[in-house]
Amino acid sequence: MSSSKVKAHKVHLLIEEIPTIEQMKKSFLDLYDGWKCPSCGLEDETFDHVWTCDEHRSLLLKIKNNTIDLLLSLLIEYNPDITDYSALLMLNIWTISTDPDNFTFVDLIKGFIPLELTQILNLWIQLLLVIIEIRQYIYEQTFKEIWIRRCSFIKEFERSLGITKKKKLTLKNFRPFNNILNSDRELEYKFDALDSIRNNIYFGKNIIEFYSNLTS
């Protein structure tokens, strides 16, 4: 996959807009209405469900454990004097679930690095290179082991039903004009919001105040 496609996919992860079944229903409801998760066949395939689906649990546990092993090996490499990792291992980020009040491993998949993690790592090492390596490892493993497999299955299933890219484009082109306008406005709003977030972070403004203004 080209670097530009990788960057685009990482942005879609960050804003939870990878093409899940629920996301595809927004553009192709006639095609995907009634479809469930392609892995378990039981639940709606939302962004969170892709990673927390019971069919993916063993894979995600393996990726999580390997991530911890990689992180510990990097810490030992950069600082062999560390002897107690309990504070790091007790963080909620190693939980395989979603939580509106706490960061979990699903948030690491999105690309977020929680402050509580950086605060602990900062006590031991210069953390930038470690964070970059850990983020990339999580991205590559979840992409290859979960997302690519899921997409390959969907493509084969759609092909068996005669659903082609041309058919999707035909259906999408017949969306009501008002829906197209609303979709364009929504996309423009999202990009404006992302630019505002970036500027608030870059220039040290109050991010909480920004969110309050954005949602008021």
Regions found by a protein language model. Name each.
Residues 1-216:
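Family-specific functional microsites
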